[in-house]
Amino acid sequence: MGRRWGSPALQRFPVLVLLLLLQVCGRRCDEAAPCQPGFAAETFSFSVPQDSVAAGRELGRVSFAACSGRPWAVYVPTDTRFKVNGDGVVSTKRPLTLYGRKISFTIYAQDAMGKRHSARVTVGRHRHRRHHHNHHLQDTTPAVLTFPKHDPGFLRRQKRDWVIPPISCLENHRGPYPMRLVQIKSNKDKESKVYYSITGQGADSPPVGIFIIERETGWLEVTEQLDREKIDRYTLLSHAVSASGQPVEDPMEIIITVMDQNDNKPVFIKEVFVGYIEENAKPGTSVMTVNATDADDAVNTDNGIVSYSIVSQQPPRPHPQMFTIDPAKGIISVLGTGLDRETTPNYTLIVQATDQEGKGLSNTATAIIEVTDANDNIPIFNPTMYEGVVEENKPGTEVARLTVTDQDAPGSPAWQAVYHIKSGNLDGAFSIITDPSTNNGILKTAKGLDYETKSRYDLVVTVENKVPLSVPITLSTASVLVTVLDVNEPPVFVPPIKRVGVPEDLPVGQQVTSYTAQDPDRDMRQKITYRMGSDPAGWLYIHPENGIVTATQPLDRESVHAINSTYKAIILAVDNGIPDTTGTGTLLLLLQDVNDNGPTPEPRSFEICSRQPEKQILSIVDKDLPPHTYPFKAALEHGSSNNWTVEIRGQDELAMGLKKELEPGEYNIFVKLTDSQGKAQVTQVKAQVCECEGTAKNCERRSYIVGGLGVPAILGILGGILALLILLLLLLLFARRRKVEKEPLLPPEDDMRDNVYNYDEEGGGEEDQDYDLSQLHRGLDARPEVIRNDVAPPLMAAPQYRPRPANPDEIGNFIDENLKAADTDPTAPPYDSLLVFDYEGGGSEATSLSSLNSSASDQDQDYDYLNEWGNRFKKLAELYGGGEDDE
């Protein structure tokens, strides 16, 4: 047995077991090690390259273990100018200036048990500056970046504390390319084959291919020159996978910072800057600000920090350094005294901007400074005495123009004049303004002047500039004499608006009031006459001499011309000046109400059902005013109460209803309403009775029926009217059927005597045989308006008669043609119904027709022409034409 234990195999076995137990115990002890909450350090220091720190600038990171199982914590800084993210990154909340000093503050955080921990943070400027011209920072970049370990006992703590330092790469590096930056390695590369790759901007995202990684070795390389002004920072993710493509590490973030090189010179925002400064300005007065920008880094380096300086000044008088410039801000200000616009109106400066705080690249621009005029010369009146004449009652009239001279620059505020009336301007009667083109003062009347009140004004005017004088000097003054001219002014009513109370029942012709005007021109002693200018209703008359107003018609408060019981009339007053003028006054008659209107119902028609009707409510309207209105009384007139009822409801309502059922139709109801003073009014209201029950809807209109009469009475009235019409018709027919006895056209044959019978005396004798035939009338032809009523109207066309000729020689043809037309007229009666004769003189002394012949016998008389005169002269032709045959 001793040999067994003494064998080498048995001797090594306990040692192996012991080592295994120690390893297991060590791991268990490590796993069971408790988490220690708190900050990784008591103090943290962060540095910045310059005093000015921009808002949002990340300063660094603090490390804190909360032992809560979360990879983040809540941090509270005591300085509100800073903030701390959940991952411990400290940054500025707003722009910050250090002024060469350090800022310290405390950060608090709580662990999982609620215990409060603190750490001190200090922020200061890093004095050692590097300009980064051509050297690079490869030696500051770690040669190898290893993926974080993932051991179970340290996974959580290592993930929280692992900070990958940024990789720096200088822009514009000459290479050679590709150039290695850093090597990425995984702890698993000893266990199995690991392949590396990168993703992100510059790798597989635009710009693609700037960064590459060797697949097997993990070397990260840059393939071309970088430009910080385009992209100053690249963020990549590195990946490690096995030969089968399975990830062996979590992706690791890699930040590549492009370091600045001073490859950009400052650029002014303008090539020429223009500024203005007043002459005699004191040293230190700001003139203008020039500004230049630099694309290089001004945060971590001095490459973008610009410094300003003045290279030259033209002209160099009164000395070559009249201005200075702030190197940091570019503010140009006055350095010396003696600026004079009259000698040197402007200066030209060459301004230079240099980066690296004045030690690097530079650029220039031009600054032109205009010296403006200062108010060192007062305006002076030339001349100092003025006179003006203006008519009264003309506001805005120019009185005079005041001229001044000023030695300052024309158009400048130091030259522009401002005028003031110092004295004599009673009640603000005048105003003065400045002519902007000539700088003269224009004196005007601010309101109408009154000659009778004041006929002369003595004004004192002063002048100054818009800007105050640079030195105390007495102001220049001028005197203005203004004379007011008298003009004929219109009469003025006193008061201009007169209110008069008058009852509306004022008798016609009675005086309403007296409304007179006064003439402002007392010295002219003019006569004033009055007349109505506006009298819409024509109610008034004004006496032209004394202005007494009387009523020409009854006044009516309820008229449309009386608004709110007020009647407005315009009265005119005219003087007899040359030219005459007219004044206007307003007369307001406050009409006092009288009880002249009876109450009436509204509306004056309604519809109602014949069965079980609802009462109709009408409004009572009284145009008068209280107490000439309610309470009202209502009654029915002219028999309307037989069928209808009426009653007063409330203050001004009238309820109407049916007393009994009526036939459908339209009825007239006579309603009498009486007001509280006994004024009554009977009004006819139309009611449409409908064949319905209850409320009347879509009422069909029937025949018109008087409110107090029934159907039998109406039928009786209509029957009487019809009988009267029949009687009148019978009388007319009887009158037309009476026979008219006609007298014979000619006397019987046995009634013939020696002389012509039944001829009217036509007058005239031998002395009347010579007369003008043109003076004869043409009977009915000359009287076309005369209508024949002894025959029936013809059914055929009437004959055409020839008009009387103008030549007397054609009178024979005229008579023959018209006789023939009359004989052939079928509508002519056997005798003329109307003969019109001209007066031919006195009565004839001849006792018989035989005396017409001068010879003793009628043998030389030829009566044959009587046979040619037609049927009307046939009997006469037989009497005188047949004598020879008888013998």
Curated annotation (Swiss-Prot):
<keyword id="KW-0325">Glycoprotein</keyword>
<feature type="binding site">
    <location>
        <position position="294"/>
    </location>
    <ligand>
        <name>Ca(2+) 3</name>
    </ligand>
</feature>
<dbReference type="GO" id="GO:0005912">
    <property type="term" value="C:adherens junction"/>
</dbReference>
<dbReference type="GO" id="GO:0044331">
    <property type="term" value="P:cell-cell adhesion mediated by cadherin"/>
</dbReference>
<feature type="glycosylation site" description="N-linked (GlcNAc...) asparagine">
    <location>
        <position position="643"/>
    </location>
</feature>
<feature type="binding site">
    <location>
        <position position="263"/>
    </location>
    <ligand>
        <name>Ca(2+) 2</name>
    </ligand>
</feature>
<dbReference type="InterPro" id="IPR014868">
    <property type="entry name" value="Cadherin_pro_dom"/>
</dbReference>
<dbReference type="GO" id="GO:0007043">
    <property type="term" value="P:cell-cell junction assembly"/>
</dbReference>
<dbReference type="Pfam" id="PF08758">
    <property type="entry name" value="Cadherin_pro"/>
</dbReference>
<keyword id="KW-0965">Cell junction</keyword>
<feature type="glycosylation site" description="N-linked (GlcNAc...) asparagine">
    <location>
        <position position="346"/>
    </location>
</feature>
<keyword id="KW-0333">Golgi apparatus</keyword>
<dbReference type="GO" id="GO:0016600">
    <property type="term" value="C:flotillin complex"/>
</dbReference>
<keyword id="KW-1133">Transmembrane helix</keyword>
<keyword id="KW-0106">Calcium</keyword>
<dbReference type="InterPro" id="IPR015919">
    <property type="entry name" value="Cadherin-like_sf"/>
</dbReference>
<keyword id="KW-0732">Signal</keyword>
<dbReference type="GO" id="GO:0005911">
    <property type="term" value="C:cell-cell junction"/>
</dbReference>
<keyword id="KW-0677">Repeat</keyword>
<dbReference type="InterPro" id="IPR020894">
    <property type="entry name" value="Cadherin_CS"/>
</dbReference>
<dbReference type="InterPro" id="IPR000233">
    <property type="entry name" value="Cadherin_Y-type_LIR"/>
</dbReference>
<dbReference type="GO" id="GO:0034332">
    <property type="term" value="P:adherens junction organization"/>
</dbReference>
<dbReference type="GO" id="GO:0016339">
    <property type="term" value="P:calcium-dependent cell-cell adhesion via plasma membrane cell adhesion molecules"/>
</dbReference>
<keyword id="KW-0472">Membrane</keyword>
<protein>
    <recommendedName>
        <fullName>Cadherin-1</fullName>
    </recommendedName>
</protein>
<feature type="domain" description="Cadherin 5">
    <location>
        <begin position="600"/>
        <end position="704"/>
    </location>
</feature>
<feature type="topological domain" description="Extracellular">
    <location>
        <begin position="161"/>
        <end position="714"/>
    </location>
</feature>
<feature type="glycosylation site" description="N-linked (GlcNAc...) asparagine">
    <location>
        <position position="564"/>
    </location>
</feature>
<dbReference type="InterPro" id="IPR002126">
    <property type="entry name" value="Cadherin-like_dom"/>
</dbReference>
<feature type="propeptide">
    <location>
        <begin position="27"/>
        <end position="160"/>
    </location>
</feature>
<comment type="function">
    <text>Cadherins are calcium-dependent cell adhesion proteins. They preferentially interact with themselves in a homophilic manner in connecting cells; cadherins may thus contribute to the sorting of heterogeneous cell types. Promotes organization of radial actin fiber structure and cellular response to contractile forces, via anchoring of radial actin fibers to CDH1 junction complexes at the cell membrane. E-cadherin is a ligand for integrin alpha-E/beta-7.</text>
</comment>
<feature type="domain" description="Cadherin 2">
    <location>
        <begin position="269"/>
        <end position="381"/>
    </location>
</feature>
<feature type="domain" description="Cadherin 4">
    <location>
        <begin position="494"/>
        <end position="599"/>
    </location>
</feature>
<keyword id="KW-0963">Cytoplasm</keyword>
<dbReference type="GO" id="GO:0007416">
    <property type="term" value="P:synapse assembly"/>
</dbReference>
<dbReference type="GO" id="GO:0005794">
    <property type="term" value="C:Golgi apparatus"/>
</dbReference>
<feature type="compositionally biased region" description="Acidic residues">
    <location>
        <begin position="759"/>
        <end position="770"/>
    </location>
</feature>
<dbReference type="InterPro" id="IPR039808">
    <property type="entry name" value="Cadherin"/>
</dbReference>
<dbReference type="GO" id="GO:0045296">
    <property type="term" value="F:cadherin binding"/>
</dbReference>
<dbReference type="GO" id="GO:0016342">
    <property type="term" value="C:catenin complex"/>
</dbReference>
<keyword id="KW-1003">Cell membrane</keyword>
<keyword id="KW-0130">Cell adhesion</keyword>
